[in-house]
Design a protein with these regions (language model features):
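Substrate-binding cleft of carbohydrate-active enzyme catalytic domains
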Residues: 1, 6-7, 44-48, 52-54, ...
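Well-ordered alpha-helical scaffold segments within catalytic/enzyme domains
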Residues: 1, 53-70, 126-137, 193-205
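Single conserved hydrophobic/aromatic residue that forms the stacking wall/gate
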Residues: 2-13, 241-250
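Secondary-shell segments that build the walls of catalytic and ion/ligand-binding clefts
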Residues: 11-18, 22-23
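Active-site-adjacent structural elements in folded domains
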Residues: 23-50, 106-116, 128, 163-185
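Aromatic- and histidine-enriched alpha-helix N-cap/loop-to-helix transition segments
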Residues: 43-57, 119-124, 183-194
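Short, compositionally biased low-complexity segments
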Residues: 53, 57-64, 115-119, 233-240
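Non-catalytic carbohydrate-binding regions of carbohydrate-active enzymes
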Residues: 69, 73-109, 141-243, 247-250
Length: 250
């Protein structure tokens, strides 16, 4: 069908196309695209691996919609870009046991074993698993094992580990918080849910239920004295772990 559809759907369709851009800053593909590689082999634009995995996770649904609309050529082109993205993620963002969080504007890895602090981040892991990236190489199982070993606590999965203990200009605000607070190794309910879904998807049902039990109000009565919410409320964030004052869940 003509993408200039009625009721504004044409504009929606056009906006989807921007997801397939290879312009620096718009797609993780730019990191490994020689067309944009500056001296030193990177695009001088920070690249989010989380966004890349969101692309590979949501992309197949977009392909299915195109096929439903009879736009087979567009569907094939979109699938090719998804496959390309998966290959780029495996080549440039697999750290051996988990996926990187990003490359900064200097082309340095974020969320790698090579980093002094912030060696692993929660955000890209679940979507990479649910995108089947590296599944044939066991990357899903390795990632889940790393999550359990390095991110899990009694109160849920922390955002990153180890927490930052000093300011990193390339990371900005996240390294200004005390360890265990907000984006510096805090525990966010929403990205815990991503890992719960990913563990279930990968067949690790017990692991998924364990993580659910750590954040679900029905299972946290033993720690209710430190919760500043009603017993039926899922908190947005848990301020625990390495925090100087480990007491608040709000």
């Amino acid at each position: 069908r003509d993408p200039e559809m009625s009721r504004g759907l044409g504009d929606v369709y056009k906006r989807q196309l921007s997801c397939f851009s290879d312009t620096p800053g718009e797609s993780f593909q730019t990191y490994t695209n020689p067309k944009f590689a500056a001296e030193g082999g990177y695009s001088k634009v920070a690249e989010s691996v989380m966004v890349a995995t969101l692309f590979t996770y949501a992309g197949p649904n977009y392909v299915a919609i195109l096929k439903h609309l009879g736009m087979d050529a567009e569907a094939d082109a979109a699938q090719a870009e998804i496959d390309k993205m998966k290959a780029n993620i495996m080549e440039s963002a697999w750290d051996g046991d988990w996926f990187l969080r990003a490359y900064d504007a200097n082309g340095e890895k974020m969320g790698s074993k090579e980093c002094e602090e912030g060696q692993i981040f929660i955000e890209p892991q679940g979507f990479a698993i649910m995108s089947d990236i590296g599944k044939d190489q066991g990357c899903d199982k390795k990632t889940l094992a790393a999550i359990d070993e390095r991110l899990n606590t009694q109160h849920g999965l922390v955002l990153n580990n180890p927490a930052f203990t000093k300011y990193y200009i390339q990371y900005g605000e996240i390294s200004t918080y005390p360890g265990g607070y907000k984006e510096n190794a805090g525990i966010f309910t929403h990205n815990n849910a991503w890992i719960i879904c990913a563990a279930a998807y990968a067949g690790a049902g017990d692991q998924a239920f364990k993580y659910y039990s750590e954040i679900a109000p029905a299972f946290t009565e033993e720690t209710s004295d430190i919760h500043k919410t009603e017993p039926y409320v899922y908190g947005q964030i848990c301020l625990l772990y390495t925090s100087p004052s480990p007491r608040d869940i709000s």
